[in-house]
């Protein structure tokens, strides 16, 4: 018996890390937070690629360290996929960042810029992206509409991605502003008096009458 399963991922081992694609050169953590909340609210099971929860940017791998045959063949026009495949930084204080024994050379080089983003460093900060992901995952487990509900997109908006999740008569409107300026979203009539469903450790929106105002890289959920 086969069962269809829908996975939602922001990164994988063949594309530039979401920390660089969506976070930009300055690794905009606010943008990465709204991306994380977006992923957790989509229909399907969220699938995290190692390092997404840390906000790791794409690593710069020197030609002599490449392992990807595509990168080796097409350098420098295409630098390959090794930039998203470097070791996970577990311990920012260890010589090998907690990856391996420290006595053997890893398949790909460790990235020094990752030390400050290592698990050991982010665990110390309750407001870190890692702890935000942990809180989101725990919160999502208690939201049956997000776990099992259908999904319907709202009309296209230049700044906001919005959709409605529905399960057993319960509905959640999910709205995410992916732009660097505030945005206004016109609400469907049934959600104009809905209750705000708090996202743990995140927010960035208000409701006034028939519209929702979202801050830069803000997110907001309304529940019926």
For each predicted feature, which ranges?
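Active-site and adjacent substrate-binding regions of carbohydrate-active enzymes
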Residues: 1-224
